[in-house]
C-alpha cells in the first residue's frame, strides 16, 4: 500500500512538475508503521544530474515529495557519465532499496538488466518504455515506465508564444538530438503552426524546422 501511494505521488509530481498528488497516508497501526519504515525508495539520475532544471530535477523533486509524504527517506545517487549507470543502480540494490527510480531513456538497458536480476524490487523508469524487444510491454514485470506526452505542453507554449510575439518571430532550441528532446520542439512548432492556421498569421519559428 505504501509503495502504491509512493508511485502514485511520484507519477503525479513528475507530470505536474511541481508537487506530488498522492493521497496522504492514513493513520496506521504499529505493524503498518513498521512496514513503512522498511520501505526504502531510491532514485538515480542520468548524466545530467539532479540540478539539470529539467526531468532529472523534476523527478527528484517528485520522488522527494512522495517520500516526505510517506514519512520515509529517499536515497539518491547522481550519475556524471554513462559509465556510472550500472554501478549506481547496483549500489542501490545493495543499499536494500524496495523501489528504484531510474531517470531517462539512457538508463533503459541498465534498468532492464537489474530488474530481471532482482524481481523482488520495483523499478520505475522515467521517459522510456523499457521495451527493448518492441512487444508493447516492459521487458520485466517489475518495471513501471512513466511516459508523458510532453508535446502537448509544448504545443500550448508554442501557441501562446506565437500570440504573444510582437516581432512575428519566436525561437526554440534543444540540447542533444534525442527524441525526448525533439518532442518538445515538435510540439512547440505545431502550436505555432496551429496559431498561424487559425489566426491567419505568419509567425516564424527560428531554431527548429521539425526535421
Regions found by a protein language model. Give the residues of each.
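A residue-level marker of the well-folded mature domains of exported/periplasmic proteins
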Residues: 23-211
Amino acid at each position: 500500500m505504501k509503495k502504491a501511494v509512493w508511485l502514485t505521488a511520484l507519477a503525479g509530481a513528475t507530470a505536474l512538475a511541481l508537487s506530488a498528488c498522492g493521497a496522504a497516508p492514513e493513520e496506521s497501526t504499529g505493524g503498518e508503521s513498521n512496514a513503512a519504515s522498511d520501505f526504502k525508495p531510491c532514485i538515480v539520475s542520468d548524466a545530467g544530474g539532479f540540478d539539470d532544471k529539467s526531468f532529472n530535477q523534476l523527478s527528484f523533486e517528485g520522488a522527494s515529495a512522495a517520500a516526505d509524504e510517506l514519512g520515509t527517506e529517499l536515497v539518491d545517487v547522481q550519475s556524471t557519465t554513462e559509465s556510472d549507470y550500472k554501478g549506481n543502480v547496483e549500489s542501490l540494490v545493495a543499499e536494500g532499496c524496495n523501489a528504484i527510480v531510474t531517470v531517462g531513456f539512457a538508463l533503459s538497458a541498465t534498468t532492464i538488466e537489474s530488474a530481471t536480476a532482482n524481481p523482488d524490487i520495483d523499478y520505475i523508469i522515467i521517459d522510456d518504455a523499457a521495451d527493448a524487444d518492441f512487444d508493447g510491454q516492459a521487458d520485466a514485470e517489475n518495471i513501471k515506465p512513466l511516459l508523458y506526452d510532453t508535446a502537448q505542453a509544448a504545443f500550448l507554449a508554442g501557441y501562446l508564444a506565437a500570440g504573444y510575439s510582437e516581432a512575428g518571430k519566436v525561437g526554440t532550441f534543444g540540447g542533444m538530438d534525442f527524441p525526448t528532446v525533439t518532442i518538445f520542439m515538435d510540439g512547440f512548432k505545431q502550436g505555432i503552426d496551429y496559431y498561424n492556421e487559425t489566426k491567419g498569421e505568419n509567425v516564424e519559428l527560428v531554431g527548429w524546422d521539425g526535421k
